[in-house]
Each structure stands twice: as structure tokens, then as C-alpha cells.
Amino acid sequence: MSKTLTLAKKLVSIDSITPQDKGCQSIMISHLNDLNFEITDLKFGEVDNFWAIRGQQSPVFVFAGHTDVVPVGNESEWHMPPFSAQVKNGMLYGRGTSDMKGSLAAMLSATDRFVKDHSNHKGSIGYLITSDEEGPAINGTVKVAQYLKKINQTVDYCLVGEPSATHELGDIIKNGRRGSLNGSFKIIGKQGHIAYPHLASNPIHLVIPALNDLCNEVWDEGNEYFPATSFQISNIQSGTGVTNVIPGESNIVFNFRYSTQCTQEQLQSRVCAILDKRNFEYQITWEHSGYPFLTPKGKLVNACVNAIKTVKNINTQLSTSGGTSDGRFIAPILKTRVIELGPSNATIHQVNECVSIQDLEDLSDIYYHILKNILT
């Protein structure tokens, strides 16, 4: 059994449901200690994190990832126990195989091979690992990145091992992500009997024209890297549950996935301007969960594209689609180039999550060639 598969099975067999680590990081740290990495344990609250680095020179190339996984869901729907790390028909099954313990195993085996082949490599190799990516993401990567900034640790390039492939390994590299802005507002009306609307003020009727305005607004037209900013309503709540009462308030929850053409401040201002045009009282709150980031073509992107071409002989595509990742913390806090490159995302967060064993071996090979392209 290969080093990559051995490590993957060890990690997947641990039920590290977010924000628990349960020893996954100890396995990684033990492996990195053998390669003369300097390890810094960084526990914030109940979250385990670590920073590891080998070398003291630039460029600093960092692997970033997480050891926590999402809950398994209905275990009876799994073909095999979700933490048994079983192999069947060339696939490794288990929660976290694709997201993202398979990537962690590939990183470690690639690093081991690279250090043994190039013991005097230039620059430095780092690892930024957390157990708080799938949960609130409060005491994880964001805190580690802030710590690294505080100690003036530079990071020139960062590869996050999130599952990025759509149809085959290496077909997609995420070279950026949209920002995410959550909002919620309450429309204040006046409760009353539904047969006497003149004695009440229906907040649902009041808010519908404003919602139409928000849904029809063109926030921007995107650019060559990002699609147009998206506004989506995720929740509308109102009423008392009976048919004869006009509600006294209505609550709306929404989200922006926004491009680099907008800022959170601009979006907030424009939403309030649209609401202010309407004759109702409202209260609004905001939660910003991630800035957009973009890594343009250059040393890091080229190193990844060329590594994929070497191993898979395919031409990869750059994409900024999808949800947020911890890259949203690393890129702005450490002012660094970030890309995401990992296995298939076809079964992530699903029952019977699995990853191709051949893909894990090829991913390790790709990571090896990325290290070689940047640090030799």
C-alpha cells in the first residue's frame, strides 16, 4: 500500500467531526517532524490548529487544509461505516475522503518525496492546518493567519487542498473566490384582524415591492474572472400560523456572493437606499463572512497548470465559482497568492463520500511537481 493511501486511511478512520480533530493533526505533525519541520501548536478555544515550516528563506510555499469533517448524516444510508476507510473497486470510502483528508495525505506524501529528492531545495515549505473549517470558522485558519501576520511570517504562495475537480482530477483550479455578505432585515407593520386591514399594516404587502427591486437590481456585471454579483433571498418569515391575523412584522434573510467589482460597503449602502425608497420602518443587520480574492496568472498558477499537464496531460481551467473556503482568510490577511487544487467534489458532504485511489496518487504527484516548479 502506498504512503498516500496509508496516510489517507489513517486520517479517514478518525471521526473528527467539526470542530474536533481527535488526533489527525498528531499524525501529520509526527510525519512532518521526521522531515525536520518546526512545529507550532496553536489552540484557540476548543479548536486545534498548527503551523509547520521547513526552511527560513523565500519563497515560502504553504499547504493549507483542515482535519475536521461534516457530520455523516443518516449512517444507515452508507454502504459501509463512514469511518471504516474501506476500499472498494478502486475507491476509498469514508467521510472526509474528498473533503479533505485525501488532499492532506497527498500533501504529506508529496512533501516527503520532494524533501528526499531535493534536500537542499530553495525557499521554505509550510503547513497551515485547522480543525475549524467546516464549522463556524472562528478559531481556525483566520486566527492562525492573524498569528502569522503578528510574528511577521511571510507567505508567498498558498495551496488549499479543497476538492476542486469537476469531471476529472486537475480539470479545474480555483484561483479565486467570491466574497460573501449576509444580511437580514425586519419590516415593522401593525398586527390586526385580517377582516379589518384598515386598522393594521401588513408588513408582507409592504415588503414585496422592495424585494422585487432587490431581486431585479443589477449589482455589477462581473469581470473576466468573476460572474456578476448574485443576490439571493434565503428565508422569509412572517405570520402567526393562523389565517385570520395580519402579522406585525416580516423577517427577510438574504446573501450576496459578490465579485471584485463591488465592496461590502457599496452593497450595504445600495440595499439601504432601495429600502429607504419604500414607506415602511425596518431594522437591518449584516454579517460579512468573506472577502473576494483573486490570484491572477503568474508563478503559482503557472506552477500548478504545468504540474497538472505533466501528470495528467490535460489543460486545466481557472475558476472562481463555488462557495467560500479558508482562502478567504489567508489571501487578505497574509497578502498572498492562493489557489485551491484537490480531488473530485462529486461526493463531498454526501453519504458514501469517496475518492479514487488513483486520483490520490496522481494528486500527490501533482503536488510534488508544484513544489518542484516553485522551489527548485
UniProtKB/Swiss-Prot annotation:
Family affiliation: Belongs to the peptidase M20A family. DapE subfamily.
Molecular function GO labels: acetylornithine deacetylase activity; cobalt ion binding; succinyl-diaminopimelate desuccinylase activity; zinc ion binding
Subunit composition and interactions: Homodimer.
Active-site residues, as the UniProt record annotates them: 68, 133
Cofactor section: Zn(2+); Co(2+)
Record EC number: 3.5.1.18
Binding residue positions for Zn(2+) 1: 66, 99, 162
Cofactor details (free text): Binds 2 Zn(2+) or Co(2+) ions per subunit.
Leading EC class: hydrolase
Residues that bind Zn(2+) 2: 99, 134, 349
The protein's name in its UniProt record: Succinyl-diaminopimelate desuccinylase
Record pathway: Amino-acid biosynthesis; L-lysine biosynthesis via DAP pathway; LL-2,6-diaminopimelate from (S)-tetrahydrodipicolinate (succinylase route): step 3/3
Gene3D superfamilies for the chain: Zn peptidases
Keywords per UniProt: Amino-acid biosynthesis, Cobalt, Diaminopimelate biosynthesis, Hydrolase, Lysine biosynthesis, Metal-binding, Zinc
Entry-linked NCBIfam families: dapE_proteo, PRK13009.1
Catalysed reaction equations from the record: N-succinyl-(2S,6S)-2,6-diaminopimelate + H2O = (2S,6S)-2,6-diaminopimelate + succinate
Source organism (scientific name): Vesicomyosocius okutanii subsp. Calyptogena okutanii (strain HA)
HAMAP family attached to this UniProt entry: DapE
UniProt function note: Catalyzes the hydrolysis of N-succinyl-L,L-diaminopimelic acid (SDAP), forming succinate and LL-2,6-diaminopimelate (DAP), an intermediate involved in the bacterial biosynthesis of lysine and meso-diaminopimelic acid, an essential component of bacterial cell walls.
GO biological process, one term: L-arginine biosynthetic process
